[in-house]
A protein has these predicted regions:
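Contiguous, glycine/small-aliphatic-enriched amphipathic segments in soluble metabolic enzymes
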Residues: 1-139, 180-195
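A broad structural signal for alpha-helix termini and local helix breaks/kinks
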Residues: 52-53, 147, 153, 172
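Flexible glycine-/small-residue-enriched beta->alpha junction loops
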Residues: 79-84, 152-155, 159-165
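Glycine/threonine-rich beta-strand-loop-alpha-helix active-site module
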Residues: 130-155
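Ligand-binding beta-strand-loop-alpha-helix segment within the catalytic cores
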Residues: 158-188
């Protein structure tokens, strides 16, 4: 059986997302479960590869079916990021806001088109997105709008080897959350968890 192909959006170019993405694709445990492809800027990834002194090579591909998944080679579907001189690692800013959603949107589109089996979105910095003038309520709402799914039918899952946690509400105040939670919503969250 072929392992699933997972598109990993690299997150905030100025944040920890690219580091996490690189650590994931270089981890043998990840490769034992899936075939990862990064979605983002090769230039940004090269910046972090050099800073972290990682021994790997990037290979840009146009589509997931061109991936070879060879050891030490990280396949990247290129999505332009901000110019390297427009941001500093560790400092959120408007230059990175658009890139965060461009990377994630491209990964979600690959899944929607059936070209990958799943998407992982590395950490984003909401401050960067808002500083870029973008109205943003979190990844789940973004994914819902990108896929034409009603926002009430999208859930965020935290997943480990032994535990799955699905939030029934996201990014709202406690009073609004309590008003939204009902049996139907809990059942929808459970069904999403069981997929």
């Amino acid at each position: 059986m072929n392992k699933p192909v997972i598109a990993i959006a690299i997150g905030d170019p100025a944040g920890i997302g690219p580091e996490i993405a690189l650590a994931a694709v270089l981890d043998e445990g990840v490769h034992s479960r899936c075939r990862p492809i990064l979605v983002g800027s090769t230039e940004v990834l090269e910046l972090y590869r050099a800073q972290l002194k990682l021994s790997c090579t990037f290979r840009e591909i146009l589509a997931p079916d061109a991936a070879e998944f060879a050891p030490g080679i990280i396949e990247v579907i290129e999505v332009n990021g901000p110019p390297l001189d427009s941001f500093s690692p560790g400092k959120s800013g408007s230059a990175c806001g658009k890139a965060i959603l461009d990377y994630t949107g491209a990964a979600v589109d690959l899944a929607r088109e059936g070209k990958v089996d799943g998407v992982v979105a590395c950490p984003h910095t909401q401050q960067s997105i808002v500083a870029g003038g973008i109205d943003f309520d979190g990844y789940p709402g973004f994914v819902a709008r990108r896929t034409g799914t009603h926002v009430n039918n999208v859930f965020m899952m935290l997943y480990t080897d032994t535990l799955r946690i699905v939030h029934t509400t996201l990014h709202i105040g406690i009073r609004a959350a309590l008003e939204l939670i009902d049996i139907d919503r809990v059942v929808r969250a459970l069904r999403a968890t069981d997929r």
